[in-house]
């Protein structure tokens, strides 16, 4: 019996600190220490079970109903979590095959269910006023019919194009992370360029046109009191003046309810989200998108004349009609090549520093006295190399004098010759 005195150290009342409201029948065990001693004596009298189960843990001393309730609770909780996540967590290759169709389907879901439209009927007085103020004279060739526009976007709802682009790129980024785990797909992206033919901007203009029986006006807003109040996320203190385009009558739906079940399950599998819903942090932020023309800078080409980065000298020489004699190259000794490279390096330095002109002439004459047989090889190569280097400077690698007529980002035509920003996407115009 002396070995069983340690049973008193098992404080059965301590289970309340872990699970306070699991089972109320265990509260009857909690009592004065003398009751616990009585329980210890009872356990001592029935010590055969403890002797047989010497390796059991302290949890075996708990009541049987308490152990059963714990197991049932864990099993129910685990089954709920498994049923909740297994329905859409797996993404198969069949979901995104072919990838072109998946891209169009993904973009169409965003346009159809995450963007809502609010239109109002155009009154006759406003329509006639627009017709009178549209043309300068009555004989103008371009006239707007009085019964052409019947509905227009509600001006009280204005949605920046930047918000739509931010939402699309956020969801595309989440889908691309899921696509990276799939094998057998070459293009691991579900997104399309915003300014492409089948991109977001063209699809948006096609569904919500600027002209027609139902029109959605575009407005260009700048930093003002209105923009600070309605769109505080687009007003950045680092930017002196922010310009962006809003579309009247459009609004973003954060939790669409009319999405079909099949499309909703595909969207959740593709993005990895628990539900078909978005939040304000997915699109309400400032993200400038500026696309510049890819032009070679003439200044960088001048600085890179001695090294010719990225250009094969043999190809450059062959384009100018100069072909080196293979037999002469084989019999050319190595000291002459080293001396030719030093001469070409000094020659290109004379372009930037005119005071080294006489020094290069003296070195060329000195080379002619020591290597008379190789003098006729150095001069043609230097002359043709000089022509090949200076010819791109006189070509078309110069910035255009006139400004661009079309926007590089969305492809829309500028309304005026003095426009500094695009009226569609708000990007800055090049050449001004």
Swiss-Prot record:
This is Uncharacterized protein At2g02148. Residues 37-61, 127-151, 298-378 are annotated as: Disordered. It comes from the Eukaryota. The lineage of its organism: Eukaryota, Viridiplantae, Streptophyta, Embryophyta, Tracheophyta. InterPro entries: ZC2HC1A/B-like (IPR026319). Coiled coil: none annotated. Residues 341-366 have a biased composition (Low complexity). Residues 312-335 have a biased composition (Polar residues).
């Amino acid at each position: 019996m002396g070995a069983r005195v340690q049973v008193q150290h098992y404080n059965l009342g301590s289970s309340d600190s872990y699970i306070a409201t699991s089972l109320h029948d265990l509260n009857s065990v909690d009592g004065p220490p003398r009751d616990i001693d009585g329980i210890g004596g009872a356990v001592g009298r029935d010590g055969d079970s403890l002797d047989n189960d010497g390796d059991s843990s302290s949890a075996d001393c708990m009541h049987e109903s308490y152990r059963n309730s714990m197991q049932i609770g864990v099993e129910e909780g685990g089954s709920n979590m498994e049923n909740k996540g297994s329905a859409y967590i797996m993404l198969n290759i069949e979901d995104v095959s072919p990838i072109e169709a998946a891209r169009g389907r993904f973009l169409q879901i965003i346009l159809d269910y995450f963007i809502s439209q609010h239109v109002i009927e155009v009154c006759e007085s406003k329509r006639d006023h627009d017709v009178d103020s549209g043309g300068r004279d009555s004989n103008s060739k371009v006239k707007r019919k009085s019964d052409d526009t019947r509905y227009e976007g509600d001006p009280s709802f204005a949605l920046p194009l930047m918000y739509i682009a931010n939402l699309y790129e956020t969801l595309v980024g989440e889908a691309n992370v899921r696509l990276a785990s799939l094998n057998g797909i070459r293009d691991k992206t579900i997104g399309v360029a915003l300014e492409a033919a089948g991109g977001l901007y063209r699809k948006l203009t096609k569904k919500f046109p600027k002209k027609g029986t139902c029109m959605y006006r575009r407005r260009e807003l700048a930093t003002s009191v209105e923009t600070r109040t309605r769109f505080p996320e687009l007003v950045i203190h680092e930017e002196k003046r922010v310009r962006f385009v809003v579309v009247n009558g459009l609004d973003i739906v954060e939790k669409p309810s009319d999405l079909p079940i099949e499309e909703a399950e595909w969207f959740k599998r593709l993005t990895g989200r628990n539900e078909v819903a978005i939040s304000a942090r997915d699109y309400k932020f400032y993200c400038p998108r500026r696309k510049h023309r890819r032009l070679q800078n003439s200044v960088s080409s001048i600085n890179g004349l001695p090294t010719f980065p990225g250009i094969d000298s043999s190809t450059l020489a062959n384009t100018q009609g100069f072909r080196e004699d293979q037999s002469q190259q084989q019999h050319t000794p190595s000291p002459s090549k080293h001396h030719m490279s030093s001469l070409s390096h000094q020659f290109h330095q004379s372009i930037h520093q005119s005071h080294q002109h006489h020094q290069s002439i003296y070195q060329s004459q000195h080379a002619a006295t020591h290597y008379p047989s190789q003098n006729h090889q150095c001069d043609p190569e230097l002359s043709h190399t000089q022509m090949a280097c200076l010819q791109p400077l006189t070509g078309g690698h110069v910035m255009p004098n006139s400004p661009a007529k079309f926007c590089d980002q969305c492809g829309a035509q500028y309304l005026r010759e003095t426009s500094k920003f695009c009226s569609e996407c708000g990007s800055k115009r090049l050449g001004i």
